[in-house]
Design a protein with these regions (language model features):
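Conserved short histidine dyad/triad with adjacent acidic residue
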Residues: 39, 43-62, 96-97
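Conserved hydrophobic/aromatic beta-strand scaffold that supports enzyme active sites
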Residues: 6, 47-49, 67, 92-94
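Short histidine-centered beta-strand/loop micro-motifs
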Residues: 17, 48-49, 57-62, 79, ...
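Short, conserved beta-strand element in jelly-roll/cupin
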Residues: 52, 62-77
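Short acidic-glycine-tyrosine-enriched beta hairpin
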Residues: 81-98
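A short, N-terminal "cap"/entry segment at the start of jelly-roll beta-barrel domains
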Residues: 1-44
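A short hydrophobic beta-strand segment most commonly corresponding to one strand
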Residues: 94, 107-117
């Protein structure tokens, strides 16, 4: 196994499909597709591509740190008590442990992510 992994967005394989947990759904009927590309250690560090259709959900990061780059689409993230922040293709951000707020997908979004638990 190589220690160098290239992300080939055209050959990501079959995604894991899911829906938000009912207690996290605020509006709409979003669906998710996740392509996990690589994991390290005991899955403490993971990376992949995630896609979501329009809707609003509660985002609770807990102890997870997540780095994201939006590949396509538009989202608005609002931390509880904070100002809404809009992100679209090319934007990069980090959700730190303890983040609690809303994730609103305005246009089907696809992001590249790295999560550390």
């Amino acid at each position: 196994m190589s220690n160098l992994i290239a992300f080939d967005l055209a050959a990501t394989g079959t995604p894991c499909e899911s829906k938000p947990a009912p207690d996290r759904l605020i509006a709409g009927d979003p669906s998710y597709r996740t392509w996990e590309i690589a994991a390290a250690g005991h899955k403490d560090i993971r990376t992949g591509i995630w896609e979501a259709t329009p809707g609003i959900t509660r985002s609770i990061k807990g102890e997870t740190w997540e780095y994201c780059t939006i590949l396509s689409g538009v989202v608005v993230l609002t931390e509880d008590g904070g100002t809404p922040r809009r992100f679209s293709a090319g934007d990069t951000f980090v959700l730190r442990p303890g983040f609690v707020g809303t994730w609103e997908t305005l246009e089907t979004v696809r992001k590249l992510w790295v999560a550390v638990s």
